[in-house]
């Protein structure tokens, strides 16, 4: 899939709306615990600055439910981003209003203004047309670099591109190119490993049955109503211990056998409560089997990456996607709403 890239547009001294993925974990002191997602935005931002662009950063943090939550301000993100960039990152006092408009007008080339948490405004999640128009009016060009939320029908993902020339940031381009290769020309057999607690993965598994050679299911997914129907398919397997916190020894051995023969492995979600010593065997042994295999390995989702990091194996994975749900939806559908939005020409 060929995406319009940030490098395809004339950005010289343009005001650019830059959708980043800054949904990062904060500690009890409200400091950023993991800077990975912020670091991932730096190459695209540096390219924008090289074009003397005036940048308006768009991002969300957690799920404040459409209202202002002091502890979910993007202030810690702005501070960390400022350190990484080596320049001031101003934070707007609001998502959208007169103060924001004034701050945008004051922007000079190679400067950046980060708008406050978009999810403080309920219209973001509703994909409100009026809100999209008002945000779009702040800039001249829209760049999406937030793969992890590009499966969402939100204003900052699919609404703004209706009104502005749009393109993908460097991170989004890499994600889409990598996953497209995996989807269109994988080394077989393809083994998909799904775990965790999100029911949406059951639907993803259902859609991937025709593409994958084996689907291995663990975590809480096996107790959901949709799972028994999936198990009837010969490609799908999974079993949970009675305590509901890990997969059984029989499942571990079965999964290890399938993984050894894999040509491509896609993994999203742990096999159980890996944070607890007594429940980490399923996730740990599957992780060990994955990195020992000769397969091309792709993981997605914060818990999966955290588990592999805990077991000291994350560096042995071939590709780490920034999004679990977005990765699975892309592999199931071949695209994402946010990807389609920047491919389409402006509608209005």
List each model region and its residues.
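Active-site loop-to-helix "anion-binding N-cap" substructures in soluble metabolic enzymes
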Residues: 1-348
């Amino acid at each position: 899939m060929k995406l319009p890239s940030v490098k395809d547009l004339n950005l010289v001294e343009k005001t650019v709306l830059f959708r980043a993925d800054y949904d990062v974990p904060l500690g009890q002191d409200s400091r950023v615990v993991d800077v990975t997602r912020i670091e991932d935005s730096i190459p695209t931002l540096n390219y924008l600055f090289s074009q003397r662009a005036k940048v308006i950063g768009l991002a969300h943090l957690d799920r404040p439910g459409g209202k202002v939550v002091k502890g979910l301000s993007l202030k810690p993100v702005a501070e960390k981003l400022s350190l990484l960039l080596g320049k001031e990152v101003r934070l707007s006092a609001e998502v959208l209003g007169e103060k924001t408009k004034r701050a945008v007008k004051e922007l000079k080339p190679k400067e950046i203004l980060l708008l406050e948490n978009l999810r403080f405004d309920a219209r973001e999640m509703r994909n409100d047309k009026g809100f999209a128009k008002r945000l779009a009016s702040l800039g001249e060009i829209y760049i999406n670099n937030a793969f992890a939320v590009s499966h969402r029908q939100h204003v900052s993902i699919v609404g703004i591109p209706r009104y502005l020339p749009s393109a993908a940031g460097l991170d989004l381009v890499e994600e889409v190119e990598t996953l497209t290769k995996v989807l269109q020309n994988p080394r077989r057999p393809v083994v998909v490993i799904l775990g965790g607690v999100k029911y949406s993965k059951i639907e993803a598994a259902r859609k991937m049955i025709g593409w994958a050679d084996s689907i291995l299911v663990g975590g809480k997914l096996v107790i959901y109503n949709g799972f028994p129907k999936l198990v009837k398919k010969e490609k799908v397997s999974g079993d949970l211990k009675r305590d509901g916190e890990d997969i059984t020894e029989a499942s571990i051995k079965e999964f290890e056998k399938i993984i050894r023969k894999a040509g491509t492995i896609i993994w999203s979600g742990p096999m159980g409560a890996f944070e607890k010593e007594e429940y980490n065997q399923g996730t740990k042994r599957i992780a060990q089997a994955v990195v020992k295999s000769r397969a091309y390995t792709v993981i997605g989702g914060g818990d999966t990456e955290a588990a592999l990091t805990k077991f000291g194996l994350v560096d042995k994975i071939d590709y780490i996607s920034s999004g679990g749900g977005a990765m699975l939806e892309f592999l199931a559908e071949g695209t994402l709403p946010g990807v389609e939005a920047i491919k389409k020409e402006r509608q209005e």
